[in-house]
Regions:
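Zinc-dependent deaminase catalytic domain
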Residues: 3-198
Length: 198
């Protein structure tokens, strides 16, 4: 008999290698929304370019302490991540990292998330996923008592999802009491990084 070993992609890090070291973050002044968006854009540059996705970066911040809780980028987490194998969005990566830091499932993140958490994302959170996985808007709404504000760099281009579906996502956040604010002045740079591979 031949024992088959599980496939391991040498170009994708393991969950242990991602979670092992505590990431050091730059010091960004409280209320410097462009500074946080620049850091989210830096994360987006790590995302592998492909014609079937956008390169998105996100930063999750405890606004009361002005402390970065986690960062994430599209497809950052490996294929063997049980939370969402190989299809992790930037915002979701932020949530998974905080949950795992506390040995929790993402669904229990509300047990440890600070009451005044802010999310910075280079592209608006998805309201529909072609993969059928849970959209980022739904993930944020599950945490709406903790995530009070979402800062966005750009609207999602209509490459995959119709703009009307995306507008509904923004409206769902606002209707649930989550403030949605677009950071102006970085759109061209964010779009260039987001569209890498297209």
């Amino acid at each position: 008999t031949t024992l088959l070993k599980p496939f391991s992609n040498p170009f994708r890090p393991t969950l242990a290698s991602i979670m092992a070291p505590e990431q050091s973050h730059p010091t960004i002044a409280a209320g410097d929304h462009k500074g946080y968006m620049e850091y989210a854009l830096e994360q987006a540059r790590h995302s592998p370019p492909a014609p079937t996705k956008f390169c998105v970066g996100a930063v999750l911040v405890d606004a009361d302490k002005n402390e970065i809780l986690s960062t994430g980028w599209s497809l950052e987490l490996p294929d063997n991540n049980p939370a969402d194998p190989g299809k992790t969005h930037a915002e979701q990566c932020c949530f998974i990292k905080v949950a795992q830091k506390h040995n929790l499932q993402e669904e229990r993140l509300c047990e440890v998330l600070p009451k005044n958490t802010v999310l910075y994302t280079t592209m608006e959170p998805c309201n529909k996923r072609l993969s059928g996985n849970k959209p980022c808007v739904d993930r944020i709404l599950r945490l709406k008592d903790y995530i009070k504000t979402v800062y966005i760099g750009i609207k999602e281009p209509e490459n995959f999802i119709d703009q009307s579906v995306l507008v509904i996502g923004r409206k769902r956040l606002v209707d649930a009491g989550v403030e949605v604010t677009f950071i102006e002045g970085m759109e061209d740079r964010i779009l260039e990084v987001s569209m890498a591979g297209h």
